[in-house]
Amino acid sequence: MRTTGFSGLLSATVVGVYVLVVVGATAALADAAAACQGWPLCGGDLSDPSVPVAVLHRGVAAVVGLLVIATAVVGWSETTARVKTTLALALALYPAQVVLGALVATGSALANLHLFVAMAIFAVLVVGLAWHLEAETGSDDAPESPPELAPPVDEEPAATEQPALSGLARAKATARAYFELTKPRLMWLLCLVAGAGMVIAGTPTVRTVVFTLGGGVLAIGASGTFNHVLERDIDRRMERTSDRPIATHEVPVANALAFGGLLAVASLWAFLSVNLLAAALGLAAIAFYSVVYTLILKPNTVQNTVIGGAAGALPALIGYAAVTGTIGIGGLVLAAVIFLWTPAHFYNLALAYKDDYERGGFPMMPVVRGETETRKHIVFYLGATLLGAGALAAVTDLGWLYAATAVLAAGVFLWAVVELHYEQTDRAAFRSFHASNAYLGLVLVAILIDSLAV
């Protein structure tokens, strides 16, 4: 199935409105837009370099307004009643947005309301897009009754005999097994999250960076190791995880527990070298992922991914606290972005490994609610993530680099998610999964560069 013309038009309108959200939220660009003191003509000093930016902003707003009108007109004959409602809301709100923009340009203190209305238009269009994609590509694939999930394994299977290895080869294999326990693939992104939290808070010292990121790597390693221990029986049932070191008896459980405990203690020592709050948050992150997520959320509720997003959000607070010793609004909003991004990211993997998760006994969204509902929720959480990224610009001093990166990366992520609805294959799910990784990675790098360049 290929993307239809209206889906493409609606997606383009969503991106266009998001451009206005990010521009309105980014302080440097919003100040430039204020260089025009007249409306509808600019009336600014042409020698002021901010004037071209302001004129461009108004031009983009005019084009986006035409897109909103065109989307409403085309959609009125091509989509469902509830999607028409969202289009009507956007069409009604856009003139109010224009009036607010005129008042802001002529000196009225309504900039926050102007931004809020832009966010509201974006939100209703995202909901409309999710509903339209559901109606056009979805099916009634939700199970009529909860699926029969696999029961837990009661007995530890016997260890399989390992091939004989030389001393050096055995040492390398053992080191590789312990390294795999730490879930190293998670480290780069979570370190970027902590790094972004630090630079949003201020300019960290080299010592703070080293101990915070070092503590973070050790905390991730401890959490990953405990997760391997606690899920070893389930890992053996799942094709994706059946070759993990503890599941294959390559690492004994007792040794893994000792290794995880050592990493946790080292992590807390590193965080304590920064400050007490960073250490408390680091301990909370280890406990949340290892106990709350692994033992309580993941095997028992379909909302495991959503609530579990708190584990990925905590590094943002750790980074912020490492610099200031407190938790501020910038750190909280960054943490919210990560929290909202997590379902939009992980639901793609849940789609690709749906059968494996069902075999493992995990009530993931595709297993319990079906693939159609899961794809719709990816759109919802993607929209919420983008709004969070816009809010982050509003509460920080991030500039044009962040704004441009956020918009371009969002466009690619949205394209991958829309394509997922029409292609509905494992390949499309992985493409959307990688697009989500790229989105967050690029946005975090932009935060680092933009903040440090100021």
UniProtKB/Swiss-Prot annotation:
PANTHER family: PROTOHEME IX FARNESYLTRANSFERASE, MITOCHONDRIAL. GO terms for cellular component: plasma membrane. The keyword Zinc does not apply. Its main location: membrane. It is a multi-pass membrane protein. It is an enzyme of class 2 (transferase). Converts heme B (protoheme IX) to heme O by substitution of the vinyl group on carbon 2 of heme B porphyrin ring with a hydroxyethyl farnesyl side group. InterPro entries: Protohaem_IX_farnesylTrfase, UbiA_prenyltransferase, UbiA_sf. Residues 1-186 are annotated as: Unknown. This is Protoheme IX farnesyltransferase 1. Residues 187-451 are annotated as: Protoheme IX prenyltransferase. Keywords: Cell membrane, Heme biosynthesis, Membrane, Transferase, Transmembrane, Transmembrane helix. Pathway: Porphyrin-containing compound metabolism; heme O biosynthesis; heme O from protoheme: step 1/1. Residues 137-164 are annotated as: Disordered. Carbon 2 of the heme B porphyrin ring is defined according to the Fischer nomenclature. Its EC number is 2.5.1.141. It holds the Pfam family UbiA. In the C-terminal section; belongs to the UbiA prenyltransferase family. Protoheme IX farnesyltransferase subfamily.
